[in-house]
Amino acid sequence: EGVPSTAIREISLLKEMQHANIVRLQDVVHSEKRLYLVFEYLDLDLKKHMDSSPEFSKDPRLVKMFLYQILRGIAYCHSHRVLHRDLKPQ
């Protein structure tokens, strides 16, 4: 049975993604029955960061800065022929 081909394809794509605005895949661990993807550690996800910063919604410059970084990450993915169908702040 092994690892599904979709998982292998996603892992190979994630290994190629090297950009400041994309969380990096650090390692892949394959045990007997499970496959573990080890990603770069981040203190907070975007949603928690936005919720913990009341000034976020009040400062248009801050919103633009975050949006710019998100769009740079998406543009990088698109330039490598990768589409992300599940973007969310978590």
Swiss-Prot record:
<dbReference type="GO" id="GO:0005524">
    <property type="term" value="F:ATP binding"/>
</dbReference>
<dbReference type="GO" id="GO:0007165">
    <property type="term" value="P:signal transduction"/>
</dbReference>
<keyword id="KW-0418">Kinase</keyword>
<dbReference type="InterPro" id="IPR011009">
    <property type="entry name" value="Kinase-like_dom_sf"/>
</dbReference>
<feature type="active site" description="Proton acceptor">
    <location>
        <position position="86"/>
    </location>
</feature>
<keyword id="KW-0597">Phosphoprotein</keyword>
<keyword id="KW-0132">Cell division</keyword>
<comment type="similarity">
    <text>Belongs to the protein kinase superfamily. CMGC Ser/Thr protein kinase family. CDC2/CDKX subfamily.</text>
</comment>
<keyword id="KW-0723">Serine/threonine-protein kinase</keyword>
<dbReference type="GO" id="GO:0005634">
    <property type="term" value="C:nucleus"/>
</dbReference>
<comment type="function">
    <text>Plays a key role in the control of the eukaryotic cell cycle. Component of the kinase complex that phosphorylates the repetitive C-terminus of RNA polymerase II.</text>
</comment>
<dbReference type="Pfam" id="PF00069">
    <property type="entry name" value="Pkinase"/>
</dbReference>
<dbReference type="GO" id="GO:0010389">
    <property type="term" value="P:regulation of G2/M transition of mitotic cell cycle"/>
</dbReference>
<keyword id="KW-0547">Nucleotide-binding</keyword>
<dbReference type="InterPro" id="IPR050108">
    <property type="entry name" value="CDK"/>
</dbReference>
<keyword id="KW-0067">ATP-binding</keyword>
<dbReference type="GO" id="GO:0106310">
    <property type="term" value="F:protein serine kinase activity"/>
</dbReference>
<protein>
    <recommendedName>
        <fullName>Cell division control protein 2 homolog</fullName>
        <ecNumber>2.7.11.22</ecNumber>
        <ecNumber>2.7.11.23</ecNumber>
    </recommendedName>
</protein>
<dbReference type="GO" id="GO:0000082">
    <property type="term" value="P:G1/S transition of mitotic cell cycle"/>
</dbReference>
<dbReference type="GO" id="GO:0051301">
    <property type="term" value="P:cell division"/>
</dbReference>
<dbReference type="GO" id="GO:0005737">
    <property type="term" value="C:cytoplasm"/>
</dbReference>
<keyword id="KW-0131">Cell cycle</keyword>
<dbReference type="GO" id="GO:0008353">
    <property type="term" value="F:RNA polymerase II CTD heptapeptide repeat kinase activity"/>
</dbReference>
<dbReference type="GO" id="GO:0000307">
    <property type="term" value="C:cyclin-dependent protein kinase holoenzyme complex"/>
</dbReference>
<dbReference type="GO" id="GO:0030332">
    <property type="term" value="F:cyclin binding"/>
</dbReference>
<dbReference type="InterPro" id="IPR000719">
    <property type="entry name" value="Prot_kinase_dom"/>
</dbReference>
<keyword id="KW-0808">Transferase</keyword>
<dbReference type="GO" id="GO:0004693">
    <property type="term" value="F:cyclin-dependent protein serine/threonine kinase activity"/>
</dbReference>
<feature type="domain" description="Protein kinase">
    <location>
        <begin position="1"/>
        <end position="90"/>
    </location>
</feature>
<dbReference type="GO" id="GO:0051445">
    <property type="term" value="P:regulation of meiotic cell cycle"/>
</dbReference>
<keyword id="KW-0498">Mitosis</keyword>
